[in-house]
Amino acid sequence: MHCTVFFLLIACAKSSYGQTRSVSTAKSESKSDEYSYNSDAIDQSRLLRGAVNPVSENMALRKFIFDMPEMLRPEHFEPIFINPAAVKEVIKDYLAYGEALCGSGYDPRLLALFGVRPTVLKQELMKAKGVTLSVMPSSRKRPRALDEVESEVENFRNVLKDFFIPPTTTNPSKLIPDDIETLVPEHVSAHFNSLVYLMYFAVLHFDSQELATMSSSVLLKYALQKNLLLREKIESGTLGEWERDFRLMRVLNVYKSEQT
């Protein structure tokens, strides 16, 4: 009797152990299978949710990053592939080269990246497909600390606030005093000159948003005096393009008054 019970207990234990082991093995194999494709599955689900950039955009961003590895902070390498807003952080650092915000000899295309929304900037990088590299200043200085660059950007914004008032519906014309150059300290003159380049870029691409904040008559007259390319662009623009936007017409009217 006791032997029978003993053997039954052994049989039950073996059966239970076998079932437990098979379930455990199945779970283990299932988990192994899960991990074998988990990365791709996560990437695919993120793509479907829009949590990461499409592959083609990532490729373009990778080219932009790794064609200029010495010019970017290492901590920006990875985030840029995950978060489009990281592009703007990279550009902030990028603008530090060649004293682009406060020096001379910078490319207007480079300055035009200042203050651009991350989504717009990303689109521009996609369209450039490597051409963006041509806006890099010749000076290859070591990048400054990000907080220093951010401070410089903030200073630049403050200069614009101090010496330039955006147009409003109640006061659309008299936005900058005629004697602006006598009011601005000499060390700030480069900042004001940068507005000329931004104005040129805005007109070059018929960017009404840029023109909305820069097309006062005084500033435009200053730009026309300083920049021959701006004159040429206005002269080459078709009337239809200008008539479609009242800001462009404002620029054209100021240009005509400057000619008389």
Curated annotation (Swiss-Prot):
Motif (Nuclear localuization signal (NLS)): 136-148
Subcellular location: Secreted; Host nucleus
The record's note on its domains: Has the canonical translocation motif RxLR, but lacks the canonical EER motif, which characterizes most oomycete effectors identified so far.
GO CC terms of this entry: extracellular region; host cell nucleus
Domain of life: Eukaryota
Entry similarity comment: Belongs to the RxLR effector family.
Stretch forming the signal peptide: 1-18
Alphabetized UniProt keyword annotations: Host nucleus, Secreted, Signal
Presence of keyword Secreted: yes
Motif (RxLR): 46-49
Record's protein name: RxLR effector protein BLR38
Function, as annotated: Secreted effector that triggers a robust hypersensitive response (HR) in Lactuca serriola LS102. The response to BLN06 was visible as strong necrosis. Although effector recognition is frequently associated with single dominant R gene loci, the recognition of BLR38 requires 2 unlinked loci that display incomplete dominance.
Main location group: secreted
